[in-house]
């Protein structure tokens, strides 16, 4: 599946900032941003928020530097700032078992305390946050929601074309066709592209903010060690394997540093 622009017209097709990869956006960004704000509030109610104000302030400080670097970059480039409608917010979730961080559409960011064992320092934290913010800058959530819409339409067309055979198979096997296609062959390769794109953009954002992006390689080495024996085969994963990720990042570091 391509980006789907030919099927839905140029108004639904745009490009990712910096990489200029074509992407499909059928869902209004403002709609996802509003939904993200609501969900973020629910997360804050449900999860235990850390009382470590020092670390939270560090996260906010790093985030602020990345925010400003992104805005300044696009201003210098005479390009629209993709974060102009973001309402940035940061939380630190107390959960040592979860080694994760994320950024919702619109700049709603969370870091789990378990991730701090992987990041180790400011450079590492900036690398992780730069990556997560890159997902939001590249509008990956909008893109994935749009492709989900496209996939649902395609499945309905397939069901009509097969006179209900697809639905009959689903009822017999209990298998969700959309779910299966989302896991293998259609959605995952695209998701891996998004992850690699966020790796690349994240390096740029962290570097522009004054951080040593060489720490990114060490992060993924530590993550690989933490996930030893647990990491799924890349084909069935939405993320590139740690080894491939390290190789890609290593090859990009000099290029990004020189920009």
Locations of the language-model features?
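A Zn2+-metalloprotease active-site environment signal
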Residues: 3-259
């Amino acid at each position: 599946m391509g980006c789907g622009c030919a099927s839905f017209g140029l108004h639904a097709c745009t490009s990712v900032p910096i990489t200029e990869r074509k992407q499909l956006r059928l869902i209004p960004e403002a709609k996802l941003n509003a939904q993200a704000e609501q969900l973020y509030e629910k997360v804050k109610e449900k999860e235990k928020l850390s009382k470590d104000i020092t670390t939270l302030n560090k996260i906010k400080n790093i985030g602020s530097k990345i925010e400003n670097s992104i805005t300044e970059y696009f201003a210098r480039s005479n390009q629209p700032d993709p974060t102009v409608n973001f309402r940035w917010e940061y939380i630190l979730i107390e959960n040592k078992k979860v080694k994760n961080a994320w950024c919702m559409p619109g700049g709603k960011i969370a870091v789990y305390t378990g991730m701090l064992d992987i990041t180790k320092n400011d450079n590492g934290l900036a690398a992780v946050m730069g990556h997560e913010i890159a997902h939001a800058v590249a509008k990956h959530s909008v893109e994935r929601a749009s492709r989900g819409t496209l996939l649902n339409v395609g499945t309905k067309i397939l069901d009509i074309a097969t006179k209900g055979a697809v639905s009959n198979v689903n009822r017999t096997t209990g298998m969700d066709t959309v779910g299966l296609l989302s896991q293998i062959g259609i959605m995952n390769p695209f998701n891996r592209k998004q992850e690699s794109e966020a790796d690349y953009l994240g390096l740029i954002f962290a570097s522009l903010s004054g951080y040593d992006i060489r720490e990114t390689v060490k992060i993924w080495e530590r993550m690989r060690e933490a996930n030893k024996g647990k990491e799924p085969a890349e084909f069935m994963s939405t993320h590139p394997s740690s080894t491939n990720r390290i190789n890609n990042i290593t090859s990009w570091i000099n290029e990004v540093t020189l920009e």
